[in-house]
Amino acid sequence: MAKLRDYYKSHVVYDLMREFKYKSVMQVPKINKITISMGVGKSIINKKFLERAIEDLEMISGQKPVITKARKSIASFKIRQGQEIGCKVTLRRKRMWEFFERLISIAIPRIRDFRGLSIKSFDGYGNYTMGIREQIIFPEINYDTIDGIRGMNITITTNAVSDKEAYVLLRAFRFPLKNNDSIYTSTEEH
């Protein structure tokens, strides 16, 4: 079992109950799922780019990705409706907690020139999306075997009612959000 899940149940729930004055444990926000997606624009030219992206995403997540297709044709991007343009994977339960732990403790510290993640990436509904420029920050990817650098989007979906609740939830896990943006910081001291 993932350590972060145990930490959430033993510490985070009670800290958030105290801070937001929830009456029930069920009101405390939690992470529902993590979605990782890769858009592979080069797959229009060569299908091998998409195959390699699928392999990379499968190694990173531990789960087989789903191929995403274009919803409509866009001439300027040279894509047609139904054309395979990327892949995504949705992690829940055990795999979600394991990935979240690896993301916080291993992958994010390996980002070059890292100064914290922006808090402007909250969507207004308590979900957080971050972009990663290089897949090589994950230890599962062998640097010698990659054919190119690919980025990805990681969306952390919570059941928090507001961005402030989601911010406090992610900070409770020591998620490296920038401190200088203090619009979500609590008025109470811990």
Curated annotation (Swiss-Prot):
<dbReference type="GO" id="GO:0000049">
    <property type="term" value="F:tRNA binding"/>
</dbReference>
<keyword id="KW-0694">RNA-binding</keyword>
<dbReference type="Pfam" id="PF00673">
    <property type="entry name" value="Ribosomal_L5_C"/>
</dbReference>
<dbReference type="InterPro" id="IPR031309">
    <property type="entry name" value="Ribosomal_uL5_C"/>
</dbReference>
<dbReference type="GO" id="GO:0019843">
    <property type="term" value="F:rRNA binding"/>
</dbReference>
<dbReference type="GO" id="GO:1990904">
    <property type="term" value="C:ribonucleoprotein complex"/>
</dbReference>
<keyword id="KW-0699">rRNA-binding</keyword>
<protein>
    <recommendedName>
        <fullName>Large ribosomal subunit protein uL5</fullName>
    </recommendedName>
</protein>
<dbReference type="InterPro" id="IPR022803">
    <property type="entry name" value="Ribosomal_uL5_dom_sf"/>
</dbReference>
<dbReference type="InterPro" id="IPR002132">
    <property type="entry name" value="Ribosomal_uL5"/>
</dbReference>
<comment type="subunit">
    <text>Part of the 50S ribosomal subunit; part of the 5S rRNA/L5/L18/L25 subcomplex. Contacts the 5S rRNA and the P site tRNA. Forms a bridge to the 30S subunit in the 70S ribosome.</text>
</comment>
<dbReference type="GO" id="GO:0005840">
    <property type="term" value="C:ribosome"/>
</dbReference>
<dbReference type="Pfam" id="PF00281">
    <property type="entry name" value="Ribosomal_L5"/>
</dbReference>
<dbReference type="InterPro" id="IPR031310">
    <property type="entry name" value="Ribosomal_uL5_N"/>
</dbReference>
<keyword id="KW-0687">Ribonucleoprotein</keyword>
<keyword id="KW-0689">Ribosomal protein</keyword>
<comment type="function">
    <text>This is one of the proteins that bind and probably mediate the attachment of the 5S RNA into the large ribosomal subunit, where it forms part of the central protuberance. In the 70S ribosome it contacts protein S13 of the 30S subunit (bridge B1b), connecting the 2 subunits; this bridge is implicated in subunit movement. Contacts the P site tRNA; the 5S rRNA and some of its associated proteins might help stabilize positioning of ribosome-bound tRNAs.</text>
</comment>
<dbReference type="GO" id="GO:0003735">
    <property type="term" value="F:structural constituent of ribosome"/>
</dbReference>
<keyword id="KW-0820">tRNA-binding</keyword>
<dbReference type="InterPro" id="IPR020929">
    <property type="entry name" value="Ribosomal_uL5_CS"/>
</dbReference>
<dbReference type="InterPro" id="IPR020930">
    <property type="entry name" value="Ribosomal_uL5_bac-type"/>
</dbReference>
<comment type="similarity">
    <text>Belongs to the universal ribosomal protein uL5 family.</text>
</comment>
<dbReference type="GO" id="GO:0006412">
    <property type="term" value="P:translation"/>
</dbReference>
